Regions:
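Conserved "HGTGT" condensation-loop signature of ketosynthase/thiolase-family condensing enzymes
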Residues: 1-173
Length: 173
């Protein structure tokens, strides 16, 4: 695998969604209505990392963030704990899955689309997933995203990696 693009964004949390939406729209030209800050910062990070890179039809999206305490995610986790079926709208509305949906749709990513929750070694976990899919010939490009938030900042790292020919048809050459 070789890294072909990357970006890092950091915004103060006090930056309101409307201002962030305007910034993303001005820089990217994307229609970004009704999106949360989490999704907006990722769209911009991917846009900057991608630059002029032409993603192949065989691309995947691998993202990671700390588990969020949004109502939808909490409701979904409670349902799982109580052995109740997950409500489709709860799953779709969870922050990470919603962000991945918009990113994949915006950048025409039709391959694997995975969001994991983890606070440690996030980029390494994403890379391992992407390496596995590359070794199986499922993808040629991968977008790796990592979000972090604290009480003051929102941060997002985006990396674009591509298969450098190291993987053969049946795994590592």
């Amino acid at each position: 695998m070789k890294e072909v693009g990357s970006s890092y964004l950091s915004f103060e949390k006090k930056l309101d969604v409307k201002s962030l939406r305007q910034l993303v729209k001005q820089e990217t030209g994307l229609q970004v209505r009704r999106m949360d800050s989490f999704t907006l910062i990722a769209l911009l990070a991917v846009y900057r990392a991608k630059g002029d890179i032409e993603l192949s039809a065989k691309s995947g999206l691998y993202s990671c963030a700390d588990y969020f305490s949004s109502d939808s995610m909490q409701s979904m986790l409670i349902d799982v704990h109580q052995n109740n079926p997950i409500k489709p709208l709860s799953f779709v509305a969870s922050v990470g899955n919603a962000a991945n949906y918009y990113i994949a749709n915006t950048y025409a990513i039709d391959g694997p689309n995975i969001f994991i929750g983890s606070s440690k070694q996030a980029i390494e976990k994403n890379k391992l997933l992407a390496e596995t899919d590359m070794s199986l010939g499922l993808i040629e490009h991968a977008i790796l995203l990592v979000w972090q938030e604290d009480e003051n900042q929102r941060e997002c790292w985006a990396k674009i990696i591509q298969d450098d020919g190291f993987f053969g048809e049946r795994g590592v050459v």
